[in-house]
Amino acid sequence: MTTVALRTALIWNDEVMDDVVIEKPTRITVGRSGKATFVVPDIGLPPDFAIVRPGNRGYLLTLGEHMRGTICIDGEERDVADFVRRRDDGDGPGGFRATPISGRDWGVINL
């Protein structure tokens, strides 16, 4: 089985502030604490929010109702806000929605 690396970056004002490439299943978190993968000011997310976490067959991407941007899952580009609002699969609690992601998926997400 081929390992697919996961690349995530924190971009602010079109500048890469941090870039992480992982090859083993690892949570990618955003939050105010120094323990977060990407440290950000309080933006209304739970502390150390796991935006990406290992799932049963890869990774799970969790998006919140106040996030914006574009994701491409299984070759289909979708608006983040529309994706979170439409709760036909991958439901999450209280304004969040999770979906499995694979090696060819991508996204640009505004927190």
Where does each model-flagged region fall?
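Forkhead-associated
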Residues: 5, 9-110
